[in-house]
């Protein structure tokens, strides 16, 4: 009974309200951690999933062996692959397209690839004025991979112990 009366007076005297206001005041005058995005950039994780790229081997040959695992595992059906068989019996892609308007950047394609041919880079700032500008062909994906290969290799090496 005595405890109930004490709790009634505490609530009547608005003890909880003042506790809440004190907490709000503490954070109101604390240092802000806002980042002004276009001028300042926060560091990205090695596992960040941005724009796709196709990689090549050091001898210049493209890595994709046309196994079509990435196409099969893609939940958004954003990847289209066509392949031909070479004279030596290996398969290579003749068409490798990714529709970025469909892609949900889940990373399943990257995980499914047995030869690390398809990767997602740290490029997050890309745009298109028309819908067709976000439809990446094999040549465009290879160009992205060629341009950012040192960064891609460094991120793969940094993330290797977690795979």
UniProtKB/Swiss-Prot annotation:
It is found in: Cell inner membrane. GO terms for cellular component: plasma membrane. Coiled coil: none annotated. Residues 54-84, 94-123 form the 4Fe-4S ferredoxin-type domain. [4Fe-4S] cluster 2 binds at residues 74, 103, 106, 109. Keywords: 4Fe-4S, Cell inner membrane, Cell membrane, Iron, Iron-sulfur, Membrane, Metal-binding, NAD, Quinone, Repeat, Translocase, Ubiquinone. GO terms for molecular function: 4 iron, 4 sulfur cluster binding; iron ion binding; NADH:ubiquinone reductase (non-electrogenic) activity; quinone binding. It comes from the Bacteria. It is a peripheral membrane protein. Its cofactor is [4Fe-4S] cluster. It is an enzyme of class 7 (translocase). PROSITE patterns: 4FE4S_FER_1, 4FE4S_FER_2. It catalyses: a quinone + NADH + 5 H(+)(in) = a quinol + NAD(+) + 4 H(+)(out). GO terms for biological process: aerobic respiration. Binds 2 [4Fe-4S] clusters per subunit. InterPro entries: 4Fe4S_Fe-S-bd (IPR017896), 4Fe4S_Fe_S_CS (IPR017900), NADH_quinone_OxRdtase_chainI (IPR010226). Its EC number is 7.1.1.-. [4Fe-4S] cluster 1 binds at residues 64, 67, 70, 113. NDH-1 shuttles electrons from NADH, via FMN and iron-sulfur (Fe-S) centers, to quinones in the respiratory chain. The immediate electron acceptor for the enzyme in this species is believed to be ubiquinone. Couples the redox reaction to proton translocation (for every two electrons transferred, four hydrogen ions are translocated across the cytoplasmic membrane), and thus conserves the redox energy in a proton gradient. NDH-1 is composed of 14 different subunits. Subunits NuoA, H, J, K, L, M, N constitute the membrane sector of the complex. This is NADH-quinone oxidoreductase subunit I. The gene is nuoI.
